């Protein structure tokens, strides 16, 4: 049974979910100060024992009254983030960590994913939860909507709560991430964490990932083996998966001695995803006379291509062959039998949770890198071009 406490919080036995997808209402000024100072402490901008600015400086910085500043300091002191010394000033305290440790005495693992209810994420979370339940761990779950500000809030929540370990799916993993300092704070506090689906290349962190290069390589090679030589790619470029899937596509073309054609690439990111339908329509219209096949970033994109082709009157696979990636439930339940490749999903979640538990148990020699190999799932969206295949041979 799920109990709804308020709009941004869902509580379930052994599962707490925080969702930051809604914009926050206007906050009282003292609350703004509290959140800013907490953020500086949790990210390491203010170190333990460091004196924070004086009340008068804070008045000027935040444009508030002395009363508002004192109210914020009192609240932060009560929560264990600050301590005041008469005649000396106010300093960063570590009492919040001991309070948090008490709060998480029931053994809690934090999980941060980009999304919760979409695509392959329910399966991944199910795998995590099933493994944690075996050792009586609770799960504290947050989503970022692939937005770094929401990731920041999720990390602050995990640090404040004092989770015993953390499993993270990175946000916009192919771009610079401004929240690296929070991950370093977890390291400094000896809180084990691992990443799934991708990782931040700036950090040395254990991870569990599909071999995305191989996935896209196999997808492209499957089309080549069916005689296709004019093959396009739909790529998402703000996530590391997109970078490596493009790499696999380029490698497969090179191995087959086929020319890479930039005009056959359509890229998008989180912000432009809403425009993908319109952009696909233009892209397919411009290339339909030459391009015979498409490697899609994932199944979701593949099915969007199907929708656009229906509107444009492009028959799949007679006029255009397509292949997805991830073997998601939406592909399995689609009206068209999409050719795709596997993703570990639930197994990945289980293995990441198992790694965290073993780390907390003091186990040594745990893997730093785990790659899962994709397998082709044959569908009905690829046409064999026999004559062209013979020409390639």
Q: Predicted segment positions?
A:
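Short, solvent-exposed amphipathic alpha-helices that sit
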Residues: 120-134, 215-218, 240-259, 304, ...
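N-terminal helix-turn-helix DNA-binding module of bacterial transcription factors
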Residues: 2-103
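Alpha-helical recognition/docking segments in bacterial nutrient-uptake
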Residues: 2-25, 35-39, 93-218, 285
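Periplasmic-binding protein-like
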Residues: 111, 163-172, 194, 232-234, ...
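Hydrophobic alpha-helical segments within soluble ligand-binding/sensing domains
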Residues: 204-233, 243, 251, 273-282, ...
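Flexible loop/turn connectors
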Residues: 36, 281-393
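An alpha-beta-alpha
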Residues: 217-258, 263, 368-382
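Short beta-strand elements in bilobed, periplasmic/extracellular small-molecule ligand-binding domains
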Residues: 133-143, 233, 252-274
